[in-house]
């Protein structure tokens, strides 16, 4: 009996250890996320519930010029006792021709499972992006795995060109961030349907080694009638062995919440 209990406890400990290293990162374009949406209690409660399902959520399309929405939303996320923290970018659109499309990015992350160590907007000296990508470095607490997340919301009509320019961002990241060997690109790439064909994407350097596109071209990440793989995850090859899967989190059917669903990857221990 004692031996059986020891086996059970050992198995339980092994399962707990494996589970502790299973970790989920989401990307979520919360369409036109500003004070008007924050005033809709049911919508905000749905959004907060979604964030609490993941260890890190990269949010795009925060459109509030007063910069109040991201912080106000964090209070709702944590109202039930969660311990999320927020890191929010400055408004993007540094170049004069991009200012009419300026938005903020945000990372909401569970402080019990992950630490954010640094963050910065990409230094877009060549004006490759309408909204400069936002980059943050993280350390997973369960095993001290370090990685960098770069999130972007491309301009739809320039999607292919902006996705191509992520290769430049990949070269810039190690000049700005320490321990930047493992990189995760995520966000609303607009990488599908009329904005970016598979053939156009296949011609890009970011589509080839050392990069691995986790979310396939035939995915459906939006609430429109047409199935389009707008929202993507791309990881460097040295993270590929950690990726335990991906999915679309279809937690709502109303476009009042967003016109995109969250997309997420599971980042496990090295397999």
Question: What do these predicted regions represent?
Answer:
Residues 7-17:
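Bacterial N-terminal signal peptides
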Residues 1-6:
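Positively charged n-region of N-terminal signal peptides that target proteins for export
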Residues 21-271:
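Divalent cation-coordinating acidic motifs and surrounding scaffolds
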């Amino acid at each position: 009996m004692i031996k059986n209990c020891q086996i059970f406890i050992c198995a339980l400990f092994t399962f707990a250890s494996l589970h502790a290293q299973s970790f989920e990162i989401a990307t979520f374009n919360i369409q036109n996320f500003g004070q008007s949406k924050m005033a809709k209690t049911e919508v905000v409660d749905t959004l907060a519930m979604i964030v609490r399902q993941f260890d890190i959520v990269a949010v795009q399309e925060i459109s509030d010029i007063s910069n109040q929405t991201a912080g106000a939303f964090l209070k709702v996320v944590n109202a039930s006792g969660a311990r999320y923290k927020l890191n929010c970018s400055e408004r993007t659109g540094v170049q004069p021709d991009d200012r009419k499309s300026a938005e903020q990015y945000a990372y909401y992350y569970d402080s019990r499972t992950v630490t954010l160590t640094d963050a910065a907007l990409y230094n877009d000296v060549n004006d490759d992006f309408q909204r400069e990508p936002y980059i943050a470095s993280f350390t997973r607490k369960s095993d001290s795995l370090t990685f960098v997340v770069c999130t972007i919301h491309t301009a739809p009509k320039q999607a292919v060109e902006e996705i191509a320019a992520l290769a430049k961002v990949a070269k810039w990241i190690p000049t700005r961030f320490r321990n930047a060997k493992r990189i995760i690109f995520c966000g609303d790439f607009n990488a599908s349907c009329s904005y970016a064909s598979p053939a156009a994407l296949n011609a890009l350097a970011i589509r080839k080694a050392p990069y691995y596109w986790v979310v396939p071209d035939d995915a459906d990440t939006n609430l429109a009638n047409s199935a389009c793989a707008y929202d993507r995850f791309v990881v460097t090859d040295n993270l590929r062995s950690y990726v335990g899967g991906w999915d679309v989190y279809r937690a709502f059917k109303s476009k009042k919440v967003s016109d995109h669903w969250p997309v997420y990857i599971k980042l496990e221990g090295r397999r």
